[in-house]
C-alpha cells in the first residue's frame, strides 16, 4: 500500500519526527512537535496507508509523491493540535 511513499528518494533515511518535517519542508514548532511527535507520526502513517496516489500519465510529475506526502504530514500535524485544543 505504501510502495509509492518508499520510492521517494531519501525517505528511507529519515529517523526522527524532525527529520520528516525538515525533509518535506513542513513548518513546525519544535516545542510542540517534541510533545506530540508519536501521535503525529502515527496519524501520518495511517494517512499514508489510506492514500493511493492517482497517476495521471499526461501530467507526469516526479515530485507528485513528495508533494502528497508533504500534504499528509502537514495535515497530521494540524489535526493533532485541533484534537488536543493546543
UniProtKB/Swiss-Prot annotation:
It comes from the Bacteria. The gene is nifW. The keyword 4Fe-4S does not apply. InterPro entries: NifW. This is Nitrogenase-stabilizing/protective protein NifW. Keywords: Nitrogen fixation. GO terms for biological process: nitrogen fixation. Pfam families: NifW. May protect the nitrogenase Fe-Mo protein from oxidative damage.
